[in-house]
């Protein structure tokens, strides 16, 4: 590897700030520094205090009034090659025509932004000497406060960002650095590739869990008085891409427990957006506008000292003082440039909704107490206010609109309720208002129709009548749903006294003449189903010539089966028609406690209603229920398999009860 392909990199910064560290172990007395410098030989520069990874040497050490400052030189092609190959070129995709040297400075500045001084431990009562300082290590974050370094290609540019450094100190550094560099010559450091790789990887691994490291670096950079640094990502001038600018963190003022407020240097290059009231003459060259991220601050000269003082007096009280930092972590510092852009962008956007209270010429609305009775028709009130249910039309802000009728007493029909509405309704609000108005109009006729009705009486009357079923419950003309067996009158004539008396004695049952047609239709359907079941069983019932015990000729009876034949019985063997089937008894005797009820049935063949004989008793019904339960254990029942409660039995019971109630 040719060293000429990779030029030397100069590094500069404070190794320690006097009085900044409260820890006794990290705090260095100034008298010890004065006793230790100048060193007999240039101190080596390594990475993370690894002695086998030396990459440069210290050129100059000075005792500045703020702390120990150094200037060093790094000339290690192995480290440069490792960083260049490890870094992705996509980092610089947004930067055009960037030189390889600038890329190297970006990488090394952000990968090793801090420095750490290694010094010998002094025994109690021991004084420092020339062997007190051991070496200088490049690292991500040093333990001492304010130990942020800068990298550049020349010694002058490396020490330029340190504004706290006095001109005499800068001159001493440059002179000592040139002398040491002349003694070293073109010295190149070649650590092993394995050592440099472990050192660079260890820096990333050891600090990967460091929280808010860029914020800490930014604060320590300000403590060191670094302004206008070009390559450090934590500085305000670093901008690899628009999304990677550090303006959001660089404006954070240094707040640290161990920081000395007297040693904190205030930022002198705050970005200021020139307002129309300001001119280029009012802003000196000491303040950058923020448009050019790679320009440095010019050197301060005595001629412009008074102007810079006046300018700083305008900037520092509001933005650059430590006392202006809000308490807690709920606030952020925003650069003036970004803030002015937001304000100007917001001011340039026109508002879509005009302020009617400002643009309107009409007087403020005063609700009327009581209107004159001579006023008829509709009452006009200013737009923006409307009676409930009468929305204000959109787009008529400067006109008086008729809003709602009034009664003869001068007030509103629903009371003087006036509600302020918004200046303009959205489509959804307009639809809701229209729907509410339609519902109000439809409800009004219904209320007038039922006014005075029995269903709209007082609570006491409804409570007394609720104990009995009203004889005239169906008053509406709508076709309400009804269940089988219930009857609904087709006419709405007032009930007679005889019907009221009949209802009280029969418990609300209707007469047979009204329920007959419905029951005839239902019985015809049942008869058809019975005939279909008979056909599916495959057996023709034998016709008997015997007469029934009630004098009814044979052939006039409809077959009535109370249950299917039990298993094992021949399907053709059945009880003769017209003959009453004996009720099975547990004692082997035929039950005599039975009731014969003639029920009219529609005979499709005869075309007229004929009576059938149905013998029903309590013991027979109990026997049928037990027999059905025993059969359900041997047969497939869809409702039982489905696991749903059976409702067919309840329907049959209701049907039979309705039939028996109207006889």
UniProtKB/Swiss-Prot annotation:
Gene3D superfamilies: Herpesvirus/Caudovirus protease domain (3.20.16.10). Its EC number is 3.4.21.97. Coiled coil: none annotated. Transmembrane segments: none annotated. Pfam families: Peptidase_S21 (PF00716). Residues 329-348 are annotated as: Interaction with pAP. It comes from the Viruses. Region of interaction between pPR and pAP is called Amino conserved domain (ACD). The region of interaction with major capsid protein is called carboxyl conserved domain (CCD). This is Capsid scaffolding protein. It comes from Gallid herpesvirus 2 (strain Chicken/Md5/ATCC VR-987) (GaHV-2). The lineage of its organism: Viruses, Duplodnaviria, Heunggongvirae, Peploviricota, Herviviricetes.
